[in-house]
Amino acid sequence: DLDFHHYYGLTELLETWLKTQKYTIENEQDILALRKSFIDDNWEKVYDYTVTLCHNHHLRLHSIYGKRPKLITAEKQKRWVEKQRQKYGMVR
């Protein structure tokens, strides 16, 4: 089984962005209205800083960095994944 992982967790990223922009979300319409701006402002973190991992390594990553890793751990997560790939090879 393969899992998709964002080094910059979307929940943490969105919450930080909302605070920075001084936006509040009250309902689904608010989310839809802000979605494009959020993605435009965070394109790389949403789409480029991602990885596909086997399920076991994904669970291990979260056991180390937590269920909702802090944004400041993104580079550490990326290095950890690179080390795992050096040790175990790429998932095929």
Residue positions per predicted region:
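Histidine-centered nuclease catalytic patch
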Residues: D1-Y49, K67
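Extended charged
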Residues: Q29, K45-V51, H55-R92
